[in-house]
Amino acid sequence: MNNRVHQGHLARKRFGQNFLNDQFVIDSIVSAINPQKGQAMVEIGPGLAALTEPVGERLDQLTVIELDRDLAARLQTHPFLGPKLTIYQQDAMTMNFGELAEKMGQPLRVFGNLPYNISTPLMFHLFSYTDAIADMHFMLQKEVVNRLVAGPNSKAYGRLSVMAQYYCQVIPVLEVPPSAFTPPPKVDSAVVRLVPHRTMPYPVKEVRVLSRITTEAFNQRRKTIRNSLGNLFSVEVLTELGVDPAVRAENISVEQYCKMANWLSNNLPSKES
């Protein structure tokens, strides 16, 4: 028997499809999301409706974004969900979540079992819409969740950690074994809750500057900051900002990166930032 077939659908590798089929895990995720009628619930990658059905049961209306044409068609003709669903058959990476929130008249509650092959770029896409999002609950590769929640001085801490924690409060919810899926992925999974900050703990003037600094620092994570960011900050400036020039990218806190970004915004001509 082909273990990539679930409910008559062949999982497509190019879409990173692994279908959730463990009822205990499904119930735990739905409890964590706690969907309520009247909320603007949006699911990314509903697949074979493992989460869509129990969430949809609690709602009058649910919006879903599904790239796979066959799966979108199945949802359209679903016996009890069909009439409740608004289906966008497109790549979530091309979705304007700000426009969607405007259309729905309130901030979005986004959830999904994200395809692991696009989870990191999709997170960055969603971060640019945090003003339009109330919260997010995602099933991700456990290693990605570890990176999202990691603090300084750990191997898992990187650019994703800094940017996620700049935008959101990040809360791990539960771990999920490969056996909960068809076909089983080769990695462990985990569910994470991301709640966008309503008041930024460390406001920055230009997010693109923070993004630039973290990209340059973590692309050369074995180098000290005086070397990896020497083209942007002198040793004196780093010291003035409370950053030891001899440490590496992984030793610098989110707050310190934000201070560095604000200094750079104030001291670089706009065309350079």
Swiss-Prot record:
UniProt signal peptide: none
GO CC aspect terms: cytosol
Keyword Transport among UniProt keywords: no
Coiled-coil regions, chain positions: none
UniProt keyword list: Cytoplasm, Methyltransferase, RNA-binding, rRNA processing, S-adenosyl-L-methionine, Transferase
Reaction(s) this enzyme catalyzes, per UniProt: adenosine(1518)/adenosine(1519) in 16S rRNA + 4 S-adenosyl-L-methionine = N(6)-dimethyladenosine(1518)/N(6)-dimethyladenosine(1519) in 16S rRNA + 4 S-adenosyl-L-homocysteine + 4 H(+)
Stored InterPro entries: KsgA/Erm, rRNA_Ade_diMease-like_C, rRNA_Ade_Mease_Trfase_CS, rRNA_Ade_methylase_Trfase_N, rRNA_adenine_dimethylase, SAM-dependent_MTases_sf
A GO MF label: 16S rRNA (adenine(1518)-N(6)/adenine(1519)-N(6))-dimethyltransferase activity
Record localization: Cytoplasm
E.C. numbers: 2.1.1.182
Binding site for S-adenosyl-L-methionine: 18, 20, 45, 66, 91, 113
A Pfam family: RrnaAD
UniProt superkingdom: Bacteria
Biological role: Specifically dimethylates two adjacent adenosines (A1518 and A1519) in the loop of a conserved hairpin near the 3'-end of 16S rRNA in the 30S particle. May play a critical role in biogenesis of 30S subunits.
Xref: HAMAP family: 16SrRNA_methyltr_A
Family statement: Belongs to the class I-like SAM-binding methyltransferase superfamily. rRNA adenine N(6)-methyltransferase family. RsmA subfamily.
Protein name stated in the entry: Ribosomal RNA small subunit methyltransferase A
Organism the protein comes from: Klebsiella pneumoniae (strain 342)
Name of the encoding gene: rsmA
